[in-house]
C-alpha cells in the first residue's frame, strides 16, 4: 500500500535493547528480563516484549499512508494519519499480553508448539490515539451498535504484515461490532506509546489496541478495517489462539469446535526472583504483576510458603504510595497491578503467587489442568524456589 510496505526478508530490522531475551530471531520474538517488569508501573518501550510473525514493515512516506474503511458500510473511505490525529485523542493505560506468556513452563509438562516465553511476554503501556468508536461514526455506524441493517456484526483489522501462516497474505483479526462501537471498551487506533510516537516494532504508524484481550487481536501496522457479517476467517482467528482441553492432540484436533480466545484470564507472576534463586537467610522481597482481562480488576494477590496450605495477602499498587482498589472509578481497569510481600527465608522455600480478580476468578493450581497443545493461557499458580546461598538480593 502507499507509504508503507511489508518486506519479504529481514535485512532492515530496527535496533533492539541488548537486555532482551531473544526467543526467535526471524521473525523477531523477545522478552525483557522479568525483573524489568517490576521496576516501573509503565513498561519502557524498549523493554516491552516483541511479538512478530514476519519482517517489520517499513514506512517510506508517512503522508501517503492511509487506512481503508470498507465492507458492509454505505460509504467506504480512506483515512490518512492526519485524519485520525484530528479526532479526539485518548490515553488509555492498558496491559498487553501474548496468549503464549509462560508457555515454557507449560512445555515442561508435555511438548507444545509455539515460541517459548518465560513470564515477560506482557507489558503495561499508556497508549494514545483515536477511539475506534469515533472512527466508525465517520462511516455511519453509531456508537453502541451490535449489528447494522446491512448485516454487519464484526470488525476486522488487516495488517500490512505478511506472514507464512496466511500463505504470504496479511495478518488479520476481528472483534465484535458491539465492542468496537462501545466507547467504554476503549478500543484505540493508537499512534503513541508512553507519550512517544509508536516505534516500528510496536506498529508504527498505526495499530489497534484492544484492552483486556489477548495481544493477538491488537493488530499492528494497520492497513484496513473491514466491517463484516462474520468473525474474521484469518488463520490466527480460526486455527490458532483457541483454548483446547488437555485431551486434544494434533491427531484429533477440530479447530471449528472452539471459539477464538478474546479476554485473557486472571494471571500473576513473581518477577523479583528467578524460578530458582539463591538468597541469603533473612527477609526477601517478593514482587510481581497481576492482571485480568475484560476490564476486571485484581481483588487480591495471595502468597504461600507451604505449598498452598496457608496464604498471606500481598500489597498492590498502580501508583506509588496509593492504595489500589479494584473499582473502575479508582483504578486503571485495563492495567496490571504490581504486588509486593516481604517474607522471611531460613531454609529452601517454594514461594507461590496466585491472583483473584473482581469477579472472583482465581488462577488454577496446576499447569496440568490447563495444558493445551498450543501452550496458550498458562495461568497456573506461579512458583519460584529460593535456596540459601550467596546472593546479591
UniProtKB/Swiss-Prot annotation:
Cofactor binding note: Binds 1 Mo-molybdopterin (Mo-MPT) cofactor per subunit.
Instruction: Quote the InterPro entries the UniProt record gives.
Output: Ig_E-set (IPR014756), MoCF_OxRdtse_dimer (IPR005066), Mopterin_OxRdtase_euk (IPR008335), OxRdtase_Mopterin-bd_dom (IPR000572), OxRdtase_Mopterin-bd_sf (IPR036374)
- Which cofactor(s) does the record list? Mo-molybdopterin
Segments carrying the region annotation (Homodimerization) are 243-393
Q: Where is this motif: Microbody targeting signal?
A: 391-393
Q: Which domain of life is it from?
A: Eukaryota
Relate the assembly described in the record. Answer: Predominantly monomer; also homodimer.
Q: What is this protein called?
A: Sulfite oxidase
Amino acid at each position: 500500500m502507499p507509504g508503507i510496505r511489508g518486506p519479504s526478508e529481514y535485512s532492515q530490522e530496527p535496533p533492539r535493547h541488548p537486555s532482551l531475551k531473544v526467543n526467535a530471531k526471524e521473525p523477531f520474538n523477545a522478552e525483557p528480563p522479568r525483573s524489568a517488569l517490576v521496576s516501573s508501573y509503565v513498561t519502557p518501550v524498549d523493554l516491552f516484549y516483541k511479538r512478530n510473525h514476519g519482517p517489520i514493515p517499513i514506512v517510506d512516506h508517512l503522508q501517503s499512508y492511509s487506512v481503508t474503511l470498507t465492507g458492509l458500510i454505505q460509504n467506504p473511505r480512506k483515512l490518512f494519519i492526519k485524519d485520525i490525529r484530528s479526532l479526539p485523542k485518548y490515553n488509555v493505560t492498558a496491559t498487553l499480553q501474548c496468549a503464549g506468556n509462560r508457555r515454557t513452563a507449560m512445555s515442561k509438562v508435555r511438548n507444545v508448539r509455539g515460541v517459548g516465553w518465560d513470564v515477560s511476554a506482557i507489558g503495561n503501556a499508556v497508549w494514545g490515539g483515536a477511539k475506534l468508536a469515533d472512527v466508525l461514526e465517520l462511516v455511519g455506524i453509531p456508537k453502541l451498535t451490535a449489528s447494522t441493517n446491512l448485516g454487519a456484526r464484526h470488525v476486522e483489522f488487516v495488517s500490512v504484515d505478511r506472514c507464512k501462516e496466511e500463505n504470504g497474505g496479511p495478518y488479520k483479526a476481528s472483534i465484535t461490532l458491539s465492542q468496537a462501537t462501545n466507547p467504554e471498551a476503549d478500543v484505540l487506533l493508537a499512534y503513541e506509546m508512553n507519550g512517544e510516537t509508536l516505534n516500528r516494532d510496536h506498529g508504527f504508524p498505526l495499530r489497534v489496541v484492544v484492552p483486556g484481550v489477548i495481544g493477538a487481536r491488537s493488530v499492528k501496522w494497520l492497513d484496513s478495517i473491514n466491517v463484516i457479517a462474520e468473525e474474521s476467517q484469518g488463520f490466527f482467528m480460526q486455527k490458532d489462539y483457541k483454548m483446547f482441553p488437555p485431551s486434544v492432540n494434533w491427531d484429533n484436533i477440530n479447530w471449528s469446535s472452539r471459539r477464538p480466545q478474546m479476554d485473557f484470564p486472571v494471571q500473576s507472576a513473581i518477577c523479583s526472583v528467578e524460578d530458582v534463586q539463591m538468597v541469603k537467610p533473612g527477609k526477601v522481597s517478593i514482587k510481581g504483576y497481576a492482571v485480568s482481562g475484560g476490564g476486571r480488576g485484581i481483588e487480591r494477590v495471595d502468597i504461600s510458603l507451604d505449598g498452598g496450605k496457608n496464604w498471606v495477602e500481598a500489597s498492590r499498587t498502580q501508583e506509588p504510595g496509593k492504595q489500589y482498589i479494584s473499582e473502575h472509578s479508582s483504578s486503571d481497569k485495563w492495567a496490571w497491578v504490581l504486588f509486593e510481600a516481604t517474607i522471611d527465608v531460613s531454609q529452601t522455600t517454594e514461594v507461590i503467587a496466585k491472583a483473584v480478580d473482581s469477579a472472583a476468578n482465581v488462577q488454577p493450581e496446576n499447569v496440568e489442568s490447563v495444558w493445551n497443545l498450543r501452550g496458550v493461557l498458562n495461568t497456573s499458580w506461579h512458583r519460584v524456589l529460593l535456596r540459601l546461598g550467596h546472593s546479591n538480593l
